[in-house]
Amino acid sequence: MQNYKDLKVWEKSHQFALEIYRVTEGFPRQEMYGLTNQLRRAASSIAANIAEGCGRKTKPDFANFLNISLGSSNEAEYFVLLARDLK
């Protein structure tokens, strides 16, 4: 498998995670272990699963981790929508 850092999708998901960390710094303190934590974990999981998949030996294993990454992306999207609607 190739180096995950060479993948455009990994770079974009890494940037997304960094932005989520920046944005959630402004979330209320009482959300530190709630929405803030869940959103950060989902966002960082996207790039992490792409990286882990690149370390696997077979294409089906890699595809499985991309699928998990997609699930994390959907989860992060929901938490962004929730944060928006709670304002």
Model feature map: region roles:
Residues M1-K87:
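Amphipathic alpha-helical assembly/interaction segments
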